[in-house]
Amino acid sequence: MTKYWIGTVSQEHVLRGVAGGFCQVCHGKATPLNRMKRGDWLLYYSPKIRMDGAEKLQAFTAFGQVTDDTAYPFQMSETFIPFRRNVDYAETRRNCPIDIVRTHPEWKKYAAMLRYGHFEISRDFFDFVRTYMQSPPDMVGQQQGFW
């Protein structure tokens, strides 16, 4: 059965993952990544633009489907070898700001969990964010019922 997940990662790191077709969460730990199975969906939430920066973003920034079976190590530097999973990212038209997501009935349950870095969500919540991210700007709110 397909599961849906959120990963909390800076936008800068999300963009690297999208460009490279991979995901990393929780500072490169393997355990959270191995909770996901091939065919599961990952939705990235980015609280900030850069991991060590102060500029807030607070938006969902990418989503994609896991395409492999297990986490694998990847040497980024001599001293940092994080684990990754391969992901086929979907095309999006825009980020989904947190103000939009706050209107979803499950938001309160998930908001407090964002600090954990990786957790399972419902398909309904995933589809809500996905629809916003893939809708043309003039369609959002009018025909999708967002506001």
Go through each PLM region and give its residues:
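Short His-Asn-centered micro-motif
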Residues: 8, 45-46
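Compositionally biased, charged N-terminal/linker segments
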Residues: 1-38, 108, 133-147
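Short, conserved, surface-exposed binding loops centered on an aromatic residue
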Residues: 33-36, 54-58
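Short, charged beta-turn/beta-strand-edge "cap" motif at the junction between a beta-strand
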Residues: 46-52
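Aromatic- and Lys/Arg-enriched surface recognition patch
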Residues: 56-124
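Surface-exposed, flexible loop/turn segments at secondary-structure boundaries
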Residues: 12, 50, 72
